[in-house]
């Protein structure tokens, strides 16, 4: 008999994925990383900002343990406020995904290994839906609120 997991337990387990994703975003050059970035009625699990000269590149990552369809829907929505949108899940879950669905949506797929390191299974495509005014507003707010400034 399989033990049922409460939504509180799931959120706690999803939070265990935050630090590895923060480390990954730092590794690709993000100089600001904000967990639980508000976007309308949603909370982007991890939002990364890479400032390079006059251009800012932004990343949104939706963390999920199992519900990949929900993660895909959320990550697709986040393409409005970031340049690159990803989902991140434990490796054993990612191995069973049909990546063509994510590729078609332009959403990338990250996996978290049991040792806490992160790999990229599918690179995100630069969003064609990004609204610069959302990105600029979120970036300005993050200058003051970033919990993981590098």
Regions found by a protein language model. Name each.
Residues 23, 105-150:
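Non-catalytic C-terminal interaction segments of nucleic acid-processing enzymes
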Residues 21, 46-48, 57-67:
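Conserved catalytic cores of phosphodiester-cleaving nucleases, focusing on short active-site segments
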Residues 49-51, 112:
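A generic structural motif
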Residues 1-42, 52:
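Acidic-basic catalytic patches of nuclease active cores, encompassing PD-(D/E)XK
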């Amino acid at each position: 008999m399989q033990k049922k997991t409460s939504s509180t337990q799931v959120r706690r387990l999803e939070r265990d994925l935050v630090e590895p994703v923060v480390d990954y975003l730092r590794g690709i050059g993000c100089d600001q990383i904000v967990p639980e970035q508000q976007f309308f009625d949603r909370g982007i699990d991890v939002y990364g900002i890479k400032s390079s000269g006059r251009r800012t590149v932004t990343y949104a990552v939706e963390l999920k343990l199992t519900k990949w369809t929900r993660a895909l829907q959320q990550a697709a929505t986040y393409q409005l406020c970031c340049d690159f949108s990803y989902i991140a899940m434990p490796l054993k879950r990612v191995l069973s995904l049909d990546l063509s669905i994510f590729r078609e949506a332009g959403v990338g797929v990250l996996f978290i290994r049991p040792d806490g390191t992160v790999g990229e299974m599918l690179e995100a495509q630069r969003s064609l839906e990004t609204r610069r005014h959302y990105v600029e507003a979120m970036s300005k707010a993050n200058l003051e609120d970033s919990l993981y400034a590098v």
